[in-house]
């Protein structure tokens, strides 16, 4: 088992509904440790840059509008096979198809506003972590 780091966003809908603590509890219950965290209100440019891979999709404008609609929490999670472990507790992109007990099944209303983000691979995790955090902001959990 490899210790990995992955990147998480609690999106504006879940922050607005006061679900930050409940979602952090899901991370910790799954054995994922938070090694960096902060609240941000994304600019249009930040949201467009983060989701650049989707810039040609029909939903891109709606996605950027949603992601800039209120504050978010961004965090780095560390643990065994963290990328996959985090995607598993997150659930499918469309909450209507997310497995019972997953974050998106329990906290999201629709594919447009689906509560949380998780990196889909180690490479995207490294890129997404670096998009929001400097190396000095990551706090190894050695104790
Ligand atoms: P994820 O990795 O599970 O978040 O899914 P994707 O990388 O495929 O899409 C990124 C984000 O774009 C999703 O989490 C949704 O917020 C949004 N998204 C994806 N598909 C749709 C769609 O059909 N309509 C809208 N409005 N948003 C979508
Ligand atoms: Mg994705």
UniProtKB/Swiss-Prot annotation:
**Superkingdom, according to UniProt?**
Bacteria
Q: Does the keyword Cytoplasm apply?
A: yes
Q: Which cofactor does it need?
A: Mg(2+)
- InterPro entries, from UniProt? NDK-like_dom (IPR034907), NDK-like_dom_sf (IPR036850), Nucleoside_diP_kinase (IPR001564), Nucleoside_diP_kinase_AS (IPR023005)
One GO MF term: ATP binding
Keywords assigned by UniProt, alphabetized: ATP-binding, Cytoplasm, Kinase, Magnesium, Metal-binding, Nucleotide metabolism, Nucleotide-binding, Phosphoprotein, Transferase
Which residues does the Swiss-Prot or TrEMBL record annotate as the active site?
Answer: 117 (pros-phosphohistidine intermediate)
Q: Where in the cell is it found?
A: Cytoplasm
* Top EC group: transferase
Transmembrane segment boundaries: none
Q: Name one GO biological process term.
A: GTP biosynthetic process
E.C. no: 2.7.4.6
Q: What does this protein do?
A: Major role in the synthesis of nucleoside triphosphates other than ATP. The ATP gamma phosphate is transferred to the NDP beta phosphate via a ping-pong mechanism, using a phosphorylated active-site intermediate.
Give the family, as the similarity comment puts it: Belongs to the NDK family.
Complex and partners: Homotetramer.
Name the HAMAP family on file: NDP_kinase
Please identify the protein, giving its name as recorded: Nucleoside diphosphate kinase
């Amino acid at each position: 088992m490899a210790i990995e780091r992955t990147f998480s966003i609690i999106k504006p809908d879940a922050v607005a509904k006061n679900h930050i603590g409940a979602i952090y509890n899901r991370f910790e219950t799954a054995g994922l440790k938070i090694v960096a965290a902060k609240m941000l209100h994304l600019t249009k440019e930040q949201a467009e840059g983060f989701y650049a891979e989707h810039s040609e999709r029909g939903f891109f404008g709606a996605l950027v509008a949603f992601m800039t609609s209120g504050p978010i929490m961004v965090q780095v999670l560390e643990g065994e096979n963290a990328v996959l472990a985090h995607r598993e507790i997150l659930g499918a992109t469309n909450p209507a198809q997310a497995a019972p007990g997953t974050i998106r099944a329990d906290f999201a209303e629709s594919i447009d506003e689906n509560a949380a983000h998780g990196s889909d691979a180690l490479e995207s995790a490294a890129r997404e972590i670096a998009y929001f955090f400097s190396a000095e902001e990551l706090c190894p959990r050695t104790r």
